[in-house]
């Protein structure tokens, strides 16, 4: 009688061990998924760094001491999100790229060349879409107070730096 119970127990144990052991296909698929996720994170990091560089370059050109039109540019107001903490908040940046391009068009002069203004805006737009996706259903909640173009760029630079510093390496 005990031998029958022992045989049943051993059989059940073996069945449990066989069914719970990972197979080579499930291990390789989870490894492939992990590698794909790591690649996506690396691409996201690269896109964030590119966006950061473009925004920093725009800001440095605007703050150039020879930019005589900066006081005029500072009269234009931009809107920032109430709290930007996620990539979907880049929709708010995308919404303000049109007005930013118009302000950058004012800077065209002999003393301050921003000859690539159109390219900067285009690059920023493409990078933003890559980061947040093409879905435009997210509605940005803008802050009540507006910001100057310099403050606008500084806040988005800080946003990029924050996301980069908190993303897994």
From Swiss-Prot:
This is Interleukin-2. It is found in: Secreted. Glycans are attached at residue 23. It comes from Mus musculus (Mouse). GO terms for molecular function: cytokine activity; growth factor activity; interleukin-2 receptor binding. Induction: By bacterial infection. Disruption phenotype: Mutant mice exhibit lethal autoimmunity and are impaired in regulatory T-cell production. After 4 to 5 weeks of birth, they develop a thymic disorder resulting in the disruption of thymocyte maturation. Produced by immune cells including dendritic cells. In contrast, macrophages do not produce IL2 upon bacterial stimulation. GO terms for cellular component: extracellular space. It comes from the Eukaryota. Residues 1-20 form the signal peptide. Disulfide bonds join 92-140. One of its GO terms (biological process) is positive regulation of plasma cell differentiation. Keywords: Adaptive immunity, Cytokine, Disulfide bond, Glycoprotein, Growth factor, Immunity, Secreted, Signal. Changing residue 30 to P: In strain: RF/J. InterPro entries: 4_helix_cytokine-like_core, IL-2, IL-2_CS. The gene is Il2. Cytokine produced by activated CD4-positive helper T-cells and to a lesser extend activated CD8-positive T-cells and natural killer (NK) cells that plays pivotal roles in the immune response and tolerance. Binds to a receptor complex composed of either the high-affinity trimeric IL-2R (IL2RA/CD25, IL2RB/CD122 and IL2RG/CD132) or the low-affinity dimeric IL-2R (IL2RB and IL2RG). Interaction with the receptor leads to oligomerization and conformation changes in the IL-2R subunits resulting in downstream signaling starting with phosphorylation of JAK1 and JAK3. Belongs to the IL-2 family.
């Amino acid at each position: 009688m005990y031998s029958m119970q022992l045989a049943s127990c051993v059989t059940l144990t073996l069945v449990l061990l066989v069914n719970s052991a990972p197979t080579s296909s499930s291990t390789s698929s989870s490894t492939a998924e992990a590698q794909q996720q790591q690649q996506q994170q690396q691409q996201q990091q690269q896109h964030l760094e590119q966006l950061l560089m473009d925004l920093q370059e725009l800001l440095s050109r605007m703050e150039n001491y020879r930019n005589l039109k900066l006081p005029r540019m500072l009269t234009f107001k931009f809107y920032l999100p109430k709290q930007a903490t996620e990539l979907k908040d880049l929709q708010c940046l995308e919404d303000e790229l049109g007005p930013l391009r118009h302000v950058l068009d004012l800077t065209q002069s002999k003393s301050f060349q921003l000859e690539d203004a159109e390219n900067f805006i285009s690059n920023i737009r493409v990078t933003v879409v890559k980061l947040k996706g093409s879905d435009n259903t997210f509605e940005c909640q803008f802050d009540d107070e507006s910001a100057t173009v310099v403050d606008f760029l500084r806040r988005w630079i800080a946003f990029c730096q924050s996301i980069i510093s908190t993303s897994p390496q």
